Amino acid sequence: MAKEVKFGRTAREKMLRGVDILADAVKVTLGPKGRNVVIEKSFGSPRTTKDGVTVAKEIELEDKFENMGAQMVKEVASKTNDTAGDGTTTATVLTQAIVREGAKSVAAGMNPMDLKRGIEIAVRTAVEDITKRSKKVKSNDEVAQVGTISANGESEIGAMIAQAMSRVGNEGVITVEEAKSLDTELDVVEGMQFDRGYLSPYFITNADKMVVELDEPLILLHEKKLTSLQPMLPVLEAVVQSGRPLLIIAEDIEGEALATLVVNKLRGGLKVAAVKAPGFGDRRKAMLEDLAVLSGGQVISEDLGIKLESVTLDMLGKAKRVSITKDDTTIVDGAGKKKDIEARVAQIKRQIEDTTSDYDKEKLQERLAKLAGGVAVIKVGGATEAEVKERKDRVDDALNATRAAVEEGIVPGGGTALLMASKAVGKLVEDNRDIQAGINIIRRALEAPIRQIVENAGVEGSIVVQKVLESKQANFGFDAQKEEYCDLVAAGIIDPTKVVRTALQDAASIAGLLITTEAMIADAPKKDNGAAAGMPGGMGGMGGMGGMDF
């Protein structure tokens, strides 16, 4: 395949054009008065969104060189979204500002590598300044404020996220789903839930709700299949003597074993229920261990030299209550020791840090959350499917921003933290003229997000920038929603430190690569010689088909 190569200024101009197209489409969504972007879908109604990364992901340009520039900026949005979960539009605006200024400097004959060094020095200084201004999130109200800002001022969403986090803890699983109704609601499942239901409807104790409810049950955890209850008879007799219900969790319970349990349950001799163990393979083993730690029991495993015949009551787990539907099992208030659970949580956290697979990380985080305290589901409602999808985007953003705020703290919002960091960057002095130019590029780029937020609100950006920079108050800034100056933290206009920091670092990283690009290579467009050229003689070769016998 032939390639097309572009060099120097021509390459950078093409790339900058791609950066501008993508950034201009994304940046209209920034701030409380940002506009929507409508995206055509191959089927169904168009999608309306104010989420920067969703807009960025949809953009593919026809010109391959312009498209390379756009794809690099898309990479910034995706990276920021993966790391901090929000701040994608801010990162895109910063990238565009840095690349524009950088391209001008390179065109003026400056050394791109020195410019990049200057950019890196300035970004380090800006990040230190932002981190210094950061303050920890203490109250539930502050959590709600962060959520509200990220959800574009919808306080209902902010309050719901704060409530979910207070119920399941900061480590807990909070998932976002589309509701079937108009209302947005919060559903909290306390305790540990896994997606396996009862193996037989004969175990049901509450026929109205079609659920199995066991109070103060003993829990038998077995890692293999159970086909016969013969080896279990000693422990079953001990359970009957204790008068407590029994929950059996095993890889599977088949044939005679299941039939015997059902018969005993129906005769009233033994209050029992059985479910399959969650997960597959090694993950199943790990989840059984989690259940053992949570319930204060032991996994009955031949690897550990424990046989079913030798199981005693003190090897069984215990819980306050177990509820089983046809799809889920929930164990509430397991009897595991607090220090054992904490040790297990610490172990899973270490595994999360060590793993490189996103899928493994997600599964480990699910396990961590289940151990740490529960699952909350925010069901997002709306009048139409398009509205539900648009709101769900915003709830996802708000949830990610809130987690980031709890992790690293908060700074004044509305682009103010970045603007204030430009003061610290402005104090940097380098002897090398080109490195100094790189520092100045960042100093000017740090103004871009607040300018864009203000301009989206229909106000002149440079006036606001000047007024905020002149102020001596720590949290002074511009409220674009009300179009007035105020103490941003007091007004609840705050951004997570992690989001602001990540947006700047990711933007500078990709922009540095774009500025130092000197050549671009893409597939050359195919030359179209006309379709008929490949078949001379008007398909004469098919003349012999006349004698074919059909």
Swiss-Prot record:
GO molecular function annotations of the record: ATP binding; ATP-dependent protein folding chaperone; isomerase activity; unfolded protein binding
Binding positions for ATP per the UniProt entry: T29, L30, G31, P32, K50, D86, G87, T88, T89, T90, G414, D495
Subcellular location: Cytoplasm
PROSITE patterns cross-referenced by the UniProt entry: CHAPERONINS_CPN60 (PS00296)
Protein name per Swiss-Prot or TrEMBL: Chaperonin GroEL
CDD domains recorded: GroEL (cd03344)
Enzyme Commission number(s) of this protein: 5.6.1.7
Coiled coil: none
Source organism: Parvibaculum lavamentivorans (strain DS-1 / DSM 13023 / NCIMB 13966)
Known catalytic reactions: ATP + H2O + a folded polypeptide = ADP + phosphate + an unfolded polypeptide
